[in-house]
């Protein structure tokens, strides 16, 4: 939304929207990450399980939907500047990258702010996974599965947005 708001009306290149886009990308995985909080659901004596489930699911789905809506905005903004095939390729990549971010948050306990507060340790951890991929099968399993899930959800929502609903009278 900020990119749309502050973009230059002229045809000249402006760095500002791309900086905003970089910050958006840094925090985007937090939206689908909330789904992994469902792993913490346990039966408790004083609180009904259905209450915890409905509360957590409502927050997780709301976060996911707002995240995917923000991606729709980024998609539309990029399509005005880049070839459609390139934007589709980038969107698929962003969603798999988000799967990797979800893995880093859920299993390695890193978060977006660690890029500023502890960048070397975070970059070392990321580099280790790329330099020694066979030593980290869980990394790639979670990344691929979450990437597939996020891509499935995003492209379903995008196809609904693109196709008008026809009613018959």
Language model: regions and residue ranges:
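Alpha-helical transmembrane segments and their immediate interhelical/interface regions
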Residues: 47-79
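Membrane-interface helix-boundary motifs at transmembrane edges
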Residues: 4-16, 76-86
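Hydrophobic alpha-helical transmembrane segments
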Residues: 56-65, 129-150
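Transmembrane alpha-helical segments in integral membrane proteins
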Residues: 65-77, 143-167
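Interfacial helix-loop-helix junctions of multi-pass membrane proteins
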Residues: 38-39, 104-118
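Transmembrane alpha-helix boundary signature
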Residues: 2-9, 31-42
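Hydrophobic alpha-helical membrane-insertion segments
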Residues: 21-26, 90-109
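Short, membrane-exposed interhelical loops at transmembrane-helix boundaries
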Residues: 114-136
């Amino acid at each position: 939304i900020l990119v749309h708001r502050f973009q230059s009306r002229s045809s000249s290149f402006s760095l500002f929207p791309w900086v905003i886009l970089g910050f958006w990308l840094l925090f985007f995985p937090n939206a689908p990450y909330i789904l992994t909080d469902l792993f913490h659901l346990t039966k408790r004596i004083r609180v009904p399980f259905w209450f915890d489930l409905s509360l957590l699911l409502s927050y997780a789905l709301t976060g996911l939907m707002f995240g995917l809506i923000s991606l729709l905005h980024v998609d539309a903004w990029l399509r005005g500047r880049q070839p459609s095939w390139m934007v589709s390729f980038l969107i698929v990549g962003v969603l798999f990258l988000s799967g990797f971010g979800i893995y880093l948050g859920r299993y390695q306990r890193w978060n977006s702010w660690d890029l500023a507060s502890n960048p070397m340790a975070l970059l070392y951890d990321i580099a280790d996974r790329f330099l020694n991929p066979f030593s980290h099968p869980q990394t790639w399993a979670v990344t691929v599965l979450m990437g597939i899930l996020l891509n499935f959800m995003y492209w379903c929502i995008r196809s609904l947005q693109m196709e008008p609903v026809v009613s018959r009278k």
